[in-house]
Amino acid sequence: MVHFTTEEKAAVASLWAKVNVEVVGGESLARLLIVYPWTQRFFDSFGNLCSESAIMGNPKVKAHGRKVLNSFGNAIKHMDDLKGTFADLSELHCDKLHVDPPNFRLLGNMILIVLATHFSKEFTPQMQAAWQKLTNAVANALAHKYH
């Protein structure tokens, strides 16, 4: 179990309060699909993913990105029980969707990049460390069913 300090929780919550879930979520998922094109195989039903502009403008990518980032909002509310919080999603991604666990970390890294882009002044090394810890912990929680 990952332990978050009071300072880390406060840092994550303070930035989260400013996040536009639709924008950051959509950009994060789009970056994942562009930078790591093999991840597109998990999104066959999303239609046209043949180019960067098609991915960035795809409404299904944006909608699913928002959904993914909303789950991070849930994680922030339950930072002391991420495995429990993500148990159902872990089962879904393992048993039905067959998503390879390393992809969770890749998406977490995309979220960090987009947050740094949108909040450059506030995304200090300390803020990055807190968010990196959270994205890694969420990735581990999502991969829990695989073990």
Swiss-Prot record:
Gene Ontology terms: cellular component: blood microparticle; haptoglobin-hemoglobin complex; hemoglobin complex
Segments forming domain Globin: 3-147
GO MF entries: haptoglobin binding; heme binding; hemoglobin alpha binding; metal ion binding; organic acid binding; oxygen binding; oxygen carrier activity; peroxidase activity
Binding-site residues, heme b: 64, 93
GO process annotations (BP): hydrogen peroxide catabolic process
CDD domains: Hb-beta-like (cd08925)
Keywords, comma-separated and alphabetical: Heme, Iron, Metal-binding, Oxygen transport, Transport
Pfam families in the cross-refs: Globin
PROSITE patterns: GLOBIN (PS01033)
Complexes and interactors: Heterotetramer of two epsilon chains and two alpha chains.
Cited PANTHER family: HEMOGLOBIN FAMILY MEMBER (PTHR11442), HEMOGLOBIN SUBUNIT EPSILON-2 (PTHR11442:SF35)
Protein known as: Hemoglobin subunit epsilon-2
Species the sequence originates in: Capra hircus (Goat)
Species classification: Eukaryota, Metazoa, Chordata, Craniata, Vertebrata
